[in-house]
Amino acid sequence: MRRGVMGSVSVTLVLVLAATSGACSRLSPDESRAVDGDFTIVETGIPELQTALASGRVTSRQLVSAYLARIATYEDRLNAIITVNPRALEEADRLDQERAAGRVRGPLHGIPIALKDNIQTTDIRTTGGALAFRDLMPPYDATLTTLLREGGAIIIAKTVLTELAHWTAGAPTPMVANYTAVAGFAYNPYDPRMDPRPGFFDGRPVIATGGSSSGSGTAASFWAASVGSDTGGSIVSPSNQNMLVGIRPTLGRISRYGVIPITADHDTAGPMARTVADTAILMGALEGAAPDPNDAATTVCTPPANRDYTAFLDAGALKGARIGIPRAFYYDPVTVPGDARPRGGLNAAQTQLMADAIALLKAQGAEVVDPVEIPSLVAQDPGSNFLLFEYCQGAEHNRAGDANCTVNFKYGMKRDFNAWLASLGAAAPVTSLTELREWNRAHADAGAMRFGQSRLDISDEMDVERDRARNEADMAKDSRLSRAEGLDAVLEGHKLDAILTPGSSGANMAARANYPIITVPFGLVPNTPTPPFPDGFNARPMPFGVAFTGRACAEPRLIALAYAFERASRRRVAPPME
């Protein structure tokens, strides 16, 4: 067992639920695959699950039981879950009864979905991965939780995440992605082993899981799909690392109400799944038919007709599409003013994979514009170079050292986290960011401070009123570099439908522009870290994908492009769980 505080409770619960559903507590791989005859939940998409449910081949109870059995078999390897919903089977029974009575709520009716554990659920604890919140039962559901349940989804589990969405600890001891004080490290199903390198042998995974959302359970078919959140790449990164399709939508597409915040200026939720079709279905369920009065940003984009993103699943969408290839930084290393150290670029294996991706685009009839230049990535004026304006993220970026980074994340954390705590009322275990920091220090021996709390510290230094002007100035500069001199310049200047970037490298600019980005799996590359693994360690290859980024509210077009690319490539490989 590699789990941290409280984690083993989830496994025990899974075993009990699996046993009460008619399965033994430890099933063989073959038994955990079978629901009815040769039907399997492994790698099975939402449309296929719905077809099976509609035909009566399976019931929602059988689906939940099969997923619980799979969790019971493999969770100890992955540590992907913080809490399993103890009422999942009861919910499945109710939805089966509705279906039998002729009521089908939508394409997620009776489908098990997991939520990142910073998304509030009143009936399942919401920990954010922090010890202080390990028993938190919020007094209200997140808007997206309500929408999913109204659509018939079964919330089967709450997933591991990087603690507080990766806003607990940066330098000098950065928190490892998908580590929480509540549950420990999560592992990547493509190689669920610990990193054996000296200096890294502390329990962390040998293949990074990405973060702060978790893709491990979704990749391993623990559920049909999951919902993550993203402030600066937290959907794109784990999707890339776990061979998933992930969408970080335009800010405002999906309500953030009831999601533990970092900053409302960049936070969003989004779907993560094994196929583009599944993310399209989940995207429609997550977006409200009307703006959420609890989130003013939800007026930005207009939902498609009937919130149906599957209408854009067009296998021929690449024909005639204009796709830009931004070589500088994303493909080829660049130097920035005042620093001779190269930044960005790809290794040989990644370069070959991206060459294959570009060739596929051309073969599908896309008009590939190669290269295109993003002005803020090559600007020689330091004040206009995006790479020189990172967000303040570690102890070195305290008030005395934050002149050359954007304070937006740390300012937003002070403003929005305290407001979120206030919304919890009597359920809140602490009432302010200051109290949380004090609580962590008082419980350091229990594991609350394994990586420190430098990001909480620099956030708590901010004064919401006194630092408002600085935050607004930094936001304006960020918008200029990521939009006007960034994505807008390249997309509009070349009349592009999208740009294509490797792996998760395009996540940062898309997130800071609040523009949509979608990842698509595209194969495996050697896992060759620096420093290297010890002699004799047989590292397995790691996932690597591509990402399409477009203008604000361009999700329908990006989904179409991603679907066409996925259909033409078919490069997703299931993790070797069996």
What are these regions (language model features)?
Residues H109-L131, F312, A317-D339, F389-R483, ...:
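Short helix-loop capping/hinge segments that flank enzyme active sites or metal/cofactor-binding pockets
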Residues G56, G110, E150, G199, ...:
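Glycine-rich, small-residue loops and helix-cap segments
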Residues T59-R61, R77-L78, V104, H109-I111, ...:
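Loop/turn elements at helix/coil->beta-strand transitions in domains of secreted/extracellular proteins
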Residues L108-A269, N294-V300, P326-A328, D332-P333, ...:
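Short glycine/serine-rich loop/turn segments
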Residues R2-R3, G7-A100, Y330, T351-A366, ...:
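An N-terminal boundary/leader segment
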Residues E48-S55, F133-L136, D267-R274, F548-G550:
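Short, well-ordered beta-strand elements within core beta-sheets of diverse protein domains
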Residues T73, A220-V334, D339, R343, ...:
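Structural helix-boundary/capping segments
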Residues Q62-V64, D93, L147-E150, D308-D314, ...:
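Acyltransferase
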